[in-house]
Amino acid sequence: MGKPKALLLGAIDHAQATWDALSDVAELVTPTAKNRAEFIEECKSGKLDGVVAAYRTFGSISITGLVDEELVKALPESLKFIAHNGAGYDQVDVHACKARGIRVSNVPSIPDDATADVNMFLILGALRGFNTSMLALRAGQWRGNPPPPLGHDPEGKVLGILGMGGIGRNLKKKAEVFGMSVIYHNRRKLSEEQSGGAEYVSFDELLTRSDVLSLNLPLN
């Protein structure tokens, strides 16, 4: 009996060696399709029969399009598992996959630190009016015309976090380094250990008390 087949959907940027190492236990295959129509036809032709697992990157959407009900129905009957390499899985219809008996995984904690870094950068930029100054600089006006306002220090400001998941908790730690106090609202109140001492408030109180409001949750 040969090795099970693992399908790569999309280019790998940082873990090619790890993917290649899977060849010890699986036959690694890559579709020849260049777009969704070709990929569906490739699936229907039987060329991908025997694939039991697929690893998809965000870039795979240019080949497969969304992993929706139409695509799921065309996937090989042998496919039992899809590994998605991001936290958000809005490109994958998990209900359609479940109906086909296909399990789907994601990596919810991987981007927490990097996302919170960018979040903090945007908060500082909003407080200090970075965008106005950058536009003036690119226009060749060192001080701006008229000069932009000085903006606000983060120290002493109240950061309201809506959605205290991994990103929200990570952001809380970074904001406190800049002297901000943190309040939050979540679907449920977190334990003292999970919240790191941040104050849990109602949604209305969050809007009332926050100097800066950070949304860290699915917008739908």
Annotated model-derived regions:
Residues 17-23, 92-99, 188-197:
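Short loop/helix-cap segments at secondary-structure boundaries that form the rim of catalytic
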Residues 31-38, 61-64, 139-146, 193-200:
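Short gly/ser/thr-rich secondary-structure transition/capping motifs
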Residues 1-62, 179-181:
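N-terminal glycine-/charge-rich "phosphate-binding" loop or analogous flexible N-terminal tail
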Residues 22, 44-47, 71, 75, ...:
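Structural alpha-helical scaffold elements that stabilize or flank donor/cofactor-binding regions
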Residues 3, 79, 155-158:
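Phosphate-coordination loops involved in phosphoryl transfer and adenosine-cofactor binding
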Residues 50-138:
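Phosphate/diphosphate ligand-binding glycine-rich loop within oxidoreductases
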Residues 130, 147-220:
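Rossmann-like dinucleotide/phosphate-binding beta-alpha-beta segment
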